[in-house]
Each structure stands twice: as structure tokens, then as C-alpha cells.
Amino acid sequence: MDLYSELTAKYQTVPAIATEIINLEAILNLPKPTEAFMSDIHGEYNAFQHVLRNGSGNVKSKIRSCFRDEMTEATLQRFAFLVYYPSERMAAIHREMAGDDLQQWYLTTFRRLIRLLAFTATKYTRSKVRKAMAPEFVYITEELLYNDADTPDKLAYYWQIIRNLIVLEQADQWIAATCQTIQRLTVDHFHVVGDIYDRGPAPDQVVESLIRRDRRHSVDIQWGNHDILWIGGAAGSALCIANLVRISARYNNLSILEDVYGINLRHLARLAEQYYQDNPAFSPKMERSDRPITEAERLQITQIHQAIAMIQFKLEGPVIKRRPEFDMDHRLVLEKLAPDFSTIKLNGDTYTIENGCFATVDPADPYKLLPEEQEVIDSLVESFTHSEKLHRHMDFLLDHGSMYLRYNRNLLLHGCVPVDEDGNFIGLTIKGTTYTGRQLFDMLEANLRLAYSQPTENADLATDLMWYLWTGPNSPLFGKHDMTTFERYFISDPKAHVEGRNPYYHLRKDPEFIKKILAEFVLDPEVGHVINGHTPVKKGTDPIMANNKMIVIDGGFSKPYQKTTGIGGYTLLDNSYGMQLVTHQPFTTKADAITNLTDIISTRRVVETEARRRTVAETDIGTELQDEVEVLKRRLGELREED
């Protein structure tokens, strides 16, 4: 049904049409809602949750603006943490207070929350504010929010509502619900610019959090290369599965596979114990003091790590050979090993192999899987394609995700737009058609969706392209020429570890190059920005480039990268006043944050300031509403002519 038919069916009379025109044109003049951007969460659920709850620091900013000089800094901090963590902070209040002190706390807190809610809701319609409220408290909250308690006729009414909330033991529930409403209204739309998965301990909880938030909130995702592995795993790609299991072993996260997603690792553990011993190159990274393991567990993970890595290297061979268009023959590493596995020849140089573990590799046929290895990968594919929870999470990533997003004049993408040294777009030639620039992204996304819809087809081009997205030389999500996983395990010479970044990463400092990218994706080069994740911003490197047109927001949610970045992540805020880049300190623990009121915002930096406040009319949603207004005005004219 086209827009005209849809609207004329919904609004059939002159008063109905006129009322809707008035409503829409009023909305168009409201201030632009706030967007928040974050990337490279990598399973760090608690840090991610903290940023969601504090709205990238926006909640505290709202409190400061609302109450100005009425609160000391300590009082403001306590109130802010009540809004962030209402249930946990109220539990602490109940331990500290009772009787009249608790009653007074309730009365003071109710007044403050209503004031803050009113302040936060000013740029939204009543309808939108209502949708952000907990359904069970909508009536009570609206009565408190929209009634003037200073009016004598309403004063008793107002205070009776508050007293009854306390007497009927609903005060804690109302406070929690109102704090959550404030959180939702503080940031209207969240963009996750890739890499929810891998390294950290709880990517599943990050996805569950986004699912919950999306029920009343606006969320989108631009897939990262690590996310692709998990989507590919659910789609039945043996290579994606081997890679993500290897990474899970490397970061001591196999419990995510077994306990969260129900993936059967018994066959793999049995194979690993049979063929592999201890090996320092494959010992799991112990980045987290809160997740200790026994020596027996460490040995088992080390063995599993080796077993799945060998399966991965073997699986790569047939795909590279059947897809010459991928141009990846240089990654056929197993056949470059000496027959005794003591050395390997790469790019004309011979390197000594260290910590080798090639017991299952036949020098005469290096990519051939042992029957036991084939059994392992078949079992894993079966488990991944039949995991109900994994598919529910990947369905969400598919429904809310894309390779890139054009949103409110900005381009959001995780990795890069592949180019050569001169900035010319490069890509892939598939079946005689060359795809570069935006067409490359669109082709790869179409194939990803096709592969996901056909999990029993796992040797087709669409499935192979999912693996290419992870590691291919011209993959927009990888952005390097080589993924030197093999070399990093077995060769100590750093020369062999070089992966070779795409020229995009040094060209993106040039404003003219960014304008070219924006034009390629049909965005206004003069006002648009590119918002990028994927590459951690090292200490001393500016995340804002190209005269403020390129903004990189991977600052180190992932704990292993915090040594490189020196911070705990970036988020970007875009509201009616302009754009701000928020720098976060490393997150410690949720318990520390709640007990010690430890926030993680360190600095805010203005990226761009609007000459005047932007309105809804200047957003993508505003364009849609303006189209509706035009259709309704046309229909209004038709009805008046009929009269």
C-alpha cells in the first residue's frame, strides 16, 4: 500500500486530517532527539550497561542543568547513581535508613524525579513520553508530571498520590520505573557500530540488553567482523565456526558456547586430548582476574585451542582454492610448510617454526581432515545451526543490523571502504561483475542474508563470502591485506606478523577523501560525517579527523586493548546542539560502581556546534513526516473541492 492509500484510509474526514496535520507540523518543530553511538563492545556487558544507564554521561548533564546550584556535587552523584541503578541504590538506602528518615528520603526523591522527568521530557510529545513509561505506572506518573503541585486545588491530590505510593509499598517500584523512563528519554536512539562479540565474557547479555531496550527504544547495529563470525556460525559456515571457537578458547570464553548457547564441545575436547599437549603459544589469555581457572582447565583449553586452530587452517585451503576470485592463494599456509614442519617459506623468506603442533597434518595432503576432525566440525555445525538461543540473537542482529547505515546525514560503518593508495575504490569481481564502494557493501550484505536464510547450504558462494568478510583482503569489515593468525602462533619474527592496513586508514584524515566517501553513499559531503569503529585509537592519536568529518569511536571497551588506548572507550553524542565525543575511563566492576559511586566519564569534547538548534524537520524521520504532511494536505484539498 502506498503512502497516499495508507493515510487516506486512516484519516477520512476533514477534522481528522486537519488534526493530524497540526500534530505532525508541531512535531517537526521539536528539537532533534539525542543519538548515542558506541562501537567494539566485545562482550564487556557491565561497561556497556553502565554507558546505557548513564546515557554516555547525558543523564548527569541533565541533572546538573535541571537542578543547577541546588545540589552539592556529592548529592548530585548520589542522585545520578539512583537514576543509573535504582534497584541497587534503593537496597543500599534501606540498609542505611528507616522510619522518618526513609519517609523524608522518599518525599525528596519523588519531587526530584518528577522535576528531572519533566526536564528530560520537554522535547518530546506526550505520546512519546507515555510510551517510555512503565505501563503499570502511566496514569500515576502522568498525573504527577502534568499537574501543578503549587496550585492549592491540586496540592492535596498530588501529595495523596505520593503518600499512597509509600503506604501501599509501591514507592520502590515507581522510583525504579521512573528512573528507567528517564534513561530512555535521555538518549532516544542508540547506534552500535559493530563488534558486539568475542574477547569479553558476556556478548549474549549485551544482545539481550539491546533486545529489551528495543521494545521501547530505537536501536540499530552496523555489523563488525567479529559479529560476522557468529552470524556465519548460525548460518552453518564451518570456517566461521572454527574461527569463533578458536577465539573463544584464546580468551577463555568457551563457557559462552557451552553454557549460554548449548554448543556441544565434547567431540572437540576428546580430539584435543588425543593429539595435543601443553603449548605456550596456545595457552588462554588471562586478562581477567575475576575468572581464574585451574591448571587442569588451562591445559584442556590449550589443547582445544590447538585442535580447532588446525581444523581452521585445514578448512581454509578448499575455500581459497574453489574461490580464485578471492585472490587469497598467499594464505594457503599449510602447503608452504617443510615436510618435517620445522620451517615455512612465506613471501620469499624462510622462517623457523616454533611451538609447532602439526600431528594431524599430512605433508602430502595438508588440508585433508582426519575422520575425527571431520566428526568434530560436523558436530559443531549441527550444534550451531540448531541452537535456538543463538538464532534468536542472530535474528536480532539481522533484523536490526546492516553493513552500513545512512542516518541523519551521517554514514555509520564498522571497518573501511576499501581503496587503493590513490583513494580509488577497489573490491571484488564476482561472476564477471566488479563491485566497489557502496555496491561492494550492498552485494556482500545481500549474500550474507542469503547464506543466513539457507543454513543447510554451506559450500556455496554466499557462505564463503561470509568468511571472506572476516578475513578477505578487500573486506570492508577487515580492512587489512592479511590476517596473520598462523604466523603469530608459530613465528617469532615480527616481520611475518605484518597484516598491511588498507590505505583507507591513512587517507581518512583527508577531508576531500571523506567527502568522496559520503558522496559515494549518497550523502551530502558538506554536512555529513563518517562514524567509524574497528580500530582502537592509540594513546596520543586524535579520534577526530578530516576537519571533524571523520570520527573514530573504538576507544577500548575491550579490556585487552585498554593498554593500547589508555582509556575505556569512546561514545559519540549527537543532539540538537551538535556533536560531542565522550571519553570513558576503564570500567572496574558493577559492584565498585554502585558501592563507591564510580562513574567512568572523563572528558567531553565538542566535535561540532550547530548555529541554531536542529529540529525534527532536519532528520530522516522529519523527512518522512513532511511527506505525510504533503499527502494529507493534498487529501484535505480534495475533500474540500468535493464539498
From Swiss-Prot:
Keyword tags: Carbohydrate metabolism, Hydrolase, Manganese
Signal peptide residue numbers: none
Cofactor(s) needed: Mn(2+)
Entry keyword ATP-binding: no
GO molecular function (one): fructose 1,6-bisphosphate 1-phosphatase activity
Xref: Gene3D superfamilies: 3.60.21.10
EC number assigned by the record: 3.1.3.11
Enzyme class name: hydrolase
BP terms from Gene Ontology: gluconeogenesis
Sequence similarity: Belongs to the FBPase class 3 family.
UniProt protein name: Fructose-1,6-bisphosphatase class 3
Species for this entry: Lacticaseibacillus paracasei (strain ATCC 334 / BCRC 17002 / CCUG 31169 / CIP 107868 / KCTC 3260 / NRRL B-441) (Lactobacillus paracasei)
